[in-house]
Amino acid sequence: MTSQTTAIGIDIGGTGIKGGLVDLSSGELISERVKLPTPAGGKPADIVETTKAIVARLAAEDPTAPVGVCFPAIVKHGFTMSAANVSKKWIGLNAEELFETGLGRSIHFVNDADAAGYAESQFGAAKDKAGLIILTTLGTGIGSALIYNGVLIPNAELGHLEIDGADAESRASYAAKEREELTWERWAKRLQRYYSHVEFLFTPDLFIVGGGVSKNYQEFMPLLDLKTPMVPAVHRNNAGILGAAALARPGAA
């Protein structure tokens, strides 16, 4: 395959860095998924080196494939404005330039939730859907992505909306359910407050729910009463890889 139909996607997390070569016409991995542990401390130079090793393995299959990298931070013009589960040394860093120097090639650099949302719009639950799509990932926090008519609107940090005097993710994330040992029913009441508020603010056309808990969507989605349709994400473990790769394609949203 040529680089016009493939791209490399890299998903950097607090515990692991994973990547794959993606067929951009189907959204399927056409290589093995390569995963290495995130270096202890999550320092910039160490993460770049680990990423370089993964890209080198994948580029052996298609040396000219463009590269997309998604990262657990607010990303603005290539700078990381926050840092989740990695070193605070990332904050304020021109991370895109750092990766490009370390990898010796141009990349597309994006927030991890934005990459997951874009993956769903291109290859998953929102494929060919018009209007405003909101992806939320329920995990240690609440990640979010906005897609409007297939175009990514970056840095929608909807997990930090204030609900009942607290960050929404401190009360409605899956981590909050586990920490407080909430039943599905009690957790659903918190999700109801959260999604009703988001619905009021944005009037979206579709909610997509991602994160590991989305595989248990039948336990909580039927308990929610919303005007907006809600569906589970199609891509969970590979969403970041697929979205980062798709955004690396020339002319992508």
What are these regions (language model features)?
Residues 1-66, 75-79, 97-105, 119-134, ...:
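ATP-binding/phosphotransfer module of carbohydrate and carboxylate kinases, centering on a glycine-rich
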Residues 71:
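Glycine-rich nucleotide/cofactor/substrate-binding loop typically near the N-terminus or early
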Residues 80-92:
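A charged helix-plus-loop insertion that forms the helical arch/lid used to bind
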Residues 107-112:
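General beta-strand structural signal in soluble alpha/beta enzymes
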Residues 142:
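Basic- and aromatic-lined ligand-binding clefts that recognize polyanionic substrates
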